[in-house]
Each structure stands twice: as structure tokens, then as C-alpha cells.
Curated annotation (Swiss-Prot):
GO BP: bile acid biosynthetic process; bile acid catabolic process; lipid catabolic process
Molecular function GO terms recorded: bile-acid 7alpha-dehydratase activity
Group of enzyme by EC: lyase
Quaternary structure annotation from Swiss-Prot or TrEMBL: Homodimer.
UniProt protein name: Bile acid 7alpha-dehydratase
Associated pathway: Lipid metabolism; bile acid biosynthesis
Induction note: Induced by bile acids such as cholate.
Domain of life, source organism: Bacteria
Gene3D superfamilies per record: 3.10.450.50
Pfam family membership, one: SnoaL_4
Annotated catalysed reactions: 7alpha,12alpha-dihydroxy-3-oxochol-4-en-24-oyl-CoA = 12alpha-hydroxy-3-oxochola-4,6-dien-24-oyl-CoA + H2O; 7alpha-hydroxy-3-oxochol-4-en-24-oyl-CoA = 3-oxochol-4,6-dien-24-oyl-CoA + H2O; 7alpha,12alpha-dihydroxy-3-oxochol-4-en-24-oate = 12alpha-hydroxy-3-oxochola-4,6-dien-24-oate + H2O; 7alpha-hydroxy-3-oxochol-4-en-24-oate = 3-oxochola-4,6-dien-24-oate + H2O
Lineage of the organism: Bacteria, Bacillati, Bacillota, Clostridia, Lachnospirales
Glycoprotein listed as a keyword: no
Amino acid sequence: MTLEERVEALEKELQEMKDIEAIKELKGKYFRCLDGKMWDELETTLSPNIVTSYSNGKLVFHSPKEVTDYLKSSMPKEEISMHMGHTPEITIDSETTATGRWYLEDRLIFTDGKYKDVGINGGAFYTDKYEKIDGQWYILETGYVRIYEEHFMRDPKIHITMNMHK
């Protein structure tokens, strides 16, 4: 392999590593905005061509606005949520496309309303596709398949002492 070929291979490898890191940051922003209920900012993580498949394909949406409108209506301020994406497996498929798999662990606590004191714990596998537009990565397709989900009544003696949404 010539020096030029080695440099070219290293540049390609470096770009792939940068792309993987950018995708990790993108998914991190998605989860942060989801739990922070920052719907406008969450929308900036989504491709204009987004397709979702949440809850084993029961919830399918085809635009950033559809996604955030649904999330806004289904995640009221009375709900504390914590979505954690772990162990990413990201493959750069081309200069402008990538695929990712994430392990999701999520916890929800309802502090008011119809579901007051209900808790939900769950786990799922996310599968995403990403596209790069004008040098920026976006979520093109996202969805998860549940491993498990449990609902339970929280002990009334346990009190939430801090809630960023109140």
C-alpha cells in the first residue's frame, strides 16, 4: 500500500469515527429533549423524511411534526420520564447513511392526574437509520421492540422531592 493510499484509508477511517460520534451525540440529544420535553429542539434531531415505529409498530409517524405532536400529547408534565440509550452499535453504510442499534432502558413516573402514582419500567431494542444532509446527521427512521414493560403502583410513602417540570 502506498503512502497516499494509507493516508486516504486513515482519512476515511477518521471520518467514520467522527460520524459515529456525531450519531451518538444526536441520539443523546434526542433522549435529553424527550425527557426535558423540549419538543422544538427534539424536532431538530429528526430528518424531514422521518418514519417511526414505536411500541412494536403500533405508533407510526411520517414527519417531525407528527412525532413531536404525538410525544407532546402523550408525555404530559405530570409524567417524569428517563430514557437511557446504552451500548450503541453504529454502522456507517455510506457517506450519507448509517444504521444504529441501541438498548433502551426507560422509567416513567406519573405524579398527578388519572395515573397518579403509577410507575412504568421497561426495556427495548431501538433500531435507527440516519441520514446526513449538508454535513449534519439526522434520525431518518427510528423505532423499538419491547423486551419488557412493567406497570406498578408506587408506594405512597415515597415522595418525589425534585421534578424539573414543576
